[in-house]
Regions:
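Conserved C-terminal alpha-helix-loop-beta "cap" of PLP-dependent enzymes
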Residues: 297-379, 387, 419, 425-430, ...
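Gly-rich Lys/Arg/Thr-decorated short loops/hinges at beta-loop-alpha junctions or inter-strand turns
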Residues: 47-59, 77-81, 110-112, 140, ...
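Conserved PLP-enzyme active-site core in the AAT-like
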Residues: 94-255, 317-318, 330, 347, ...
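N-terminal entrance/gating region of PLP-dependent enzymes' catalytic architecture
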Residues: 1-71, 77, 267-268, 395-481
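Long, charged amphipathic helices and adjacent flexible linkers at domain junctions
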Residues: 147, 254, 384-404
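Conserved phosphate/anionic-ligand binding catalytic regions in large, soluble enzymes, centered on
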Residues: 217-230, 234-235, 279-283, 430-451, ...
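Active-site C-terminal subdomain of aminotransferase-like
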Residues: 215-316, 320, 325-327
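Short loop-beta-helix segment that forms the pyridoxal 5′-phosphate
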Residues: 24, 57-61, 65, 78-97, ...
Length: 550
């Protein structure tokens, strides 16, 4: 074994980082470039007063964080038009799977075991749903939503709004038809798009999920980011994860706490429908503060700028004789190029989404500027148009409802105001820069300063999760070494870095055990023994893996 000083660790990490190649990515697929306000980066992301706090089981020492998370829930509910929101989930794929499980558990009829998924959903989301559905006996039907056929065996459906290819469709009639067949609908959506698009709530969806990453959290090669989940009152006792509620203390003062905990795994155990425990709270706080700092007007300005630049690119390509797949879009277009563009894109250090049929997807984001549009037009051999246009989607889908009206989103728009607000909340919380936190459980770990420093290096933070493998050699080398070290530490032959939390690790392990028994022809071996002293996620994970608990 080798012992490294902190300085040597940073040098070793820098060597990993230097093997990565940072290009500007227009890949989209749920992940977008964002500008992190420095007041948030410096005073939350790099501040141990925020990143060393423990799970807020004790509300008395967590009031600052609980307020920041309540802001996140308010952001999500206002954006989606649905009254109940949690704070938060692990990623969009997990959130979609949780929505599917929630709908399934809310269905009384035993014959309802089919779930419809639009091919317009992000591919990685569909893959997560495949994994989560099989142990529960849920049958997935993946098709174009226009080909959906409703019958009594279907309990729910998932639609992407806007789609992974950028298309914006009016799902009102489809959702209404689903309701007539007692089928629940979840929309996977985008927070920035929803600032100017009609809300899922107004479309009468039962739930909405998505990734909050583009609200001030870097790519990080895929994470960590906070996912969001909102739903109707009907599901408030079935929604997964933490819900922050407003209450009063014994003196009658306003106080915040985790609400409706009796539905969660640490209380319901094997009767829980989800193993979600803590989940990306620091990132949820960053996204909520992004919304607080920008406020509704500036967020809509960012959205309109993104939509306008996307329109300029679309119009330029069309004028150059290139067919755009969809006429209605927010930030993403798909088209079939008619020139050899690869070398030009490489020279400009741009990444685009490449489909199997040779078509290209380009997603515009907050970091995109006019010069980028000019260069992209040049790459595909067309002249740029100066045409300006907003709301490049059907008029009936333009948002007219209120947005982020709460006072907290309309007060702190200067650096000084924001700095003071962040500090005020920080002082209401207990963290390692105040005292030790002797609460045990699964979350007792030190986030050392030396660990946090490299996280903000561009070579790590600015890599899109679907960047070509030749651009992420540093990450791949880091993963290889980490897997080797963890295997030696645990005495196993190999390990997986895929699970996004301890609870997801349990679930993954149980799926491996289940797959082994199935491969040996022992499908009947489906009982999982869990001691009473086990963490609540253990029995919940076993149920999700299709096992019974004793």
């Amino acid at each position: 074994s080798t012992n490294y000083s902190e300085e040597e660790v940073l040098k070793k990490l820098k060597k990993y980082a230097q093997k990565n190649t940072v290009l500007k990515s227009f890949i989209g697929q749920g992940y977008y470039g964002t500008i992190i306000p420095n007041v948030i980066k410096r005073n939350i992301f790099e501040n141990p007063g925020w990143y060393t706090q423990y799970t807020p089981y004790q509300a008395e020492i967590s009031q600052g964080r609980l307020e920041a998370l309540l802001n996140f829930q308010t952001l999500v509910s206002s954006s989606t038009g649905l009254p109940i929101s949690n704070a938060s989930l692990l990623d969009e794929g997990t959130a979609a799977a949780e929505a599917m499980a929630m709908f399934y558990n809310a269905t009384n009829a035993q014959e309802k075991n089919k779930f419809l998924i639009s091919t317009g959903c992000h591919p990685q989301t569909i893959e997560v749903l495949k994994t989560r559905a099989e142990p529960l006996g849920i049958k997935l039907i993946i098709d174009n939503e226009n080909e959906f056929i409703f019958d009594n065996s279907i309990f729910g459906m998932l639609l992407q709004y806007p789609s992974t290819d950028g298309n914006i469709a009016d799902y009102s009639n489809l959702i209404a038809d689903a309701k007539n067949h007692e089928i629940f609908t979840c929309l996977a959506s985008d927070l920035l798009a929803l600032s100017i698009l009609k809300t899922p709530g107004e479309l009468d969806a039962d739930a909405c999920v998505g990734n909050a990453q583009r609200f001030g959290v870097p790519f990080g090669f895929g994470g960590p980011h906070a996912a969001f989940f909102s739903t109707t009152e009907k599901f408030k006792r079935k929604i997964p994860g933490r819900i922050i509620g407003v209450s009063t203390d014994k003196y009658g003062n306003r106080a915040l706490r985790m609400a409706l905990q009796t539905r969660e795994q640490h209380i319901r155990r094997e009767k829980a429908t989800s193993n979600i425990c803590t989940s990306q709270v620091l990132l949820a706080i960053m996204s909520s503060m992004y919304a607080v700092y920008h406020g509704p007007n500036n967020i809509r300005t960012i959205a309109n700028n993104v939509n306008n630049l996307c329109h300029q690119l679309s119009s330029s390509l069309k004028d150059g004789g290139i067919k755009i797949f969809y006429k209605n879009f927010f930030d993403t277009i798909r088209f079939k190029p008619n020139n050899d563009w690869e070398k030009l894109a490489h020279n400009e250090k741009y990444n685009f989404r490449i489909y199997k049929d040779g078509s290209i997807g380009i997603s515009i984001d907050e970091t995109t500027v006019q010069e980028d549009i000019n260069k992209i037009c040049n790459i595909f051999g067309v002249l740029k148009t100066n045409e300006t246009s907003y709301y490049n989607f059907p008029k009936q889908l333009k948002r007219n409802s209120s947005y982020l009206e709460h006072d907290v989103f309309n007060r702190y728009h200067s650096e000084t105001e924001m700095l003071r607000y962040i500090h005020k909340l920080e002082t209401k919380d207990l963290s390692l820069n105040t005292s030790m936190i002797p609460l045990g459980s699964c979350t007792m770990k030190l986030n050392a300063t030396t660990e946090m420093v490299p996280v903000t290096w561009p070579e790590f933070s600015d890599i899109h999760p679907f960047a070509p493998l030749e651009q992420v050699r540093g990450y791949l080398s880091l993963f290889k070494d980490l897997k080797s070290w963890l295997s030696k530490l645990t005495g196993f032959d190999d390990c997986s870095l895929q699970p996004n939390s301890g609870a997801q690790g349990e679930y993954t392990g149980l799926l491996v055990i289940r797959a082994y028994h199935n491969s040996c022809g022992n499908k009947h071996r489906n009982i999982c023994l869990v001691p009473d002293s086990a963490h609540g996620t253990n029995p919940a994970s076993a149920i999700m893996a299709g096992m019974s608990v004793e």
